[in-house]
Structure formats: C-alpha cells, structure tokens
C-alpha cells in the first residue's frame, strides 16, 4: 500500500504553546482520512505543517515519498497537493470565477487555451459553469467554497488536504461537496469537527486532542 503522507512524532510550537505534541499518522493511497477534534485542537496546524507551510520543531514528515524538512523539500511537491482552506476568502484571488480557477494552471506555465478549457471543466465538475464570469466578491459563502475546490481540482492533484470543508455550509451545499469529493476518487486528509464528514466522507478517522493523535 502506497503511503502518500507520513508524519512521525511531529511537534509544533506556536507563540510558546505546544500545538502538536508528537503527532503521528499515515495517509495511504485511496484513503479519506479524517482527523477530528474540537475547535482549537490543532487540526489546521496539522494540515499546514504537512504541506510545509508551518515549521515543525521535531519529528519527521514524508510527503509523496520524499523526506521533507525545509522549504526546498516541500516546494516541488505542492503542485501535487491541493489544500482547501477553512475560509475560502483566504484562497480566492481572481477578479472573476473563471480567472480564479485559471490562476493555478497559468502560474504553472500552462498555455492560455489549455488553462481556460481546464478551468471550464473544473467549473462543470463543481456545478458552477454559469458563474464563470461572476466577480468573486459577489458569490455566496457556499459558492466561494465550491470555486475554491474547483481551483484545486483543475490542478489534477494526487492528494487533497481539506480544512473543515463543510463548515458554515447549508445542507444542500454540504451534499454537493460530498458528491464532488467522492466522485473525484482522490486520497484526502480531512480536518473536521463535523460528524457528517466522518459518516459520509471518511474511510478512516483518528482523533486529535491536546496535540496528540489517537485512533
């Protein structure tokens, strides 16, 4: 079984507070692993650390088969890992929906024609082709979450890291998010405190409490 992410005894301290205290987990290909715990348990820190966006003080991280400690280690791998932020406003940067979804491919050097068609396909995938020319600031919270997800899917990632993917969503949008994620068949690490994510999305779950992961 291929291991996509392995975190071994990872410790993270932020503002003199221990957030992760020897956290250990492994995400295997084909899994949708949920990390659940209360607000402030360190779930977001776990995801950011797994992608090298926060430094860790001790332990080890292996991402997509590569040992990762420094920015130089993580940077070449980020194009294969999609991170969905808890707040889509932290993720959306384009003036229009289509331009936002095109941004990632264009940033990787795709030609404009290829990026445009890939973005169209991603918007079809999340059910929002009719919003392609809509200014991002006019979207509802649920629409922003779906556009942010389209921006990840267009990059054809190997794995998704999802930070509270259903928080503050109505049941209709939550259902749509689940349908899209399940249809993608991607491996996922999901930080959540939503029981629906555990019941309907996760294939396995662990608990994060006081910086420690338990089964």
Residues covered by each model-derived region:
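The feature captures the beta-strand-to-loop junction immediately N-terminal to the Walker
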Residues: 36-38
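Helix-to-loop junction immediately C-terminal to a conserved catalytic motif
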Residues: 51
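Conserved ABC transporter NBD signature motif
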Residues: 56-70, 77
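Conserved ABC ATPase "signature" region
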Residues: 113-131
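Conserved ABC ATPase signature
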Residues: 135-139, 143
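Catalytic Walker B motif of ABC-type/P-loop ATPase nucleotide-binding domains
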Residues: 160-163
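H-loop/switch region of ABC-family ATPase nucleotide-binding domains
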Residues: 192-193
């Amino acid at each position: 079984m291929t291991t996509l992410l392995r975190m071994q005894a990872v410790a993270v301290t932020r503002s003199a507070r221990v957030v992760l205290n020897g956290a250990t987990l492994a995400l295997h290909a084909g899994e949708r692993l949920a990390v659940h715990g209360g607000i402030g348990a360190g779930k977001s820190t776990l995801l950011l650390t797994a992608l090298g966006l926060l430094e860790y003080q001790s332990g080890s991280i292996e991402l997509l088969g590569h040992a990762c400690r420094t920015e130089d280690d993580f940077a070449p791998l980020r194009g294969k890992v999609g991170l969905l932020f808890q707040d889509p406003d932290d993720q959306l940067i384009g003036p229009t929906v289509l331009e936002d979804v095109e941004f990632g491919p264009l940033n990787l050097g795709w030609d404009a024609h290829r990026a445009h068609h890939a973005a169209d396909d991603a918007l079809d995938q999340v059910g929002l082709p009719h919003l392609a020319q809509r200014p991002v600031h006019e979207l509802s919270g649920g629409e922003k979450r779906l556009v942010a997800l389209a921006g990840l899917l267009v990059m054809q990632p190997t794995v998704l890291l999802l930070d509270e993917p259903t928080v503050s969503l109505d049941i209709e949008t939550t259902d749509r998010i689940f349908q899209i994620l399940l249809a993608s068949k991607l491996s996922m690490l999901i930080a959540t405190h939503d029981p629906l994510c555990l019941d309907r999305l996760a294939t396995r779950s662990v608990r994060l409490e006081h910086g420690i992961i338990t089964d």
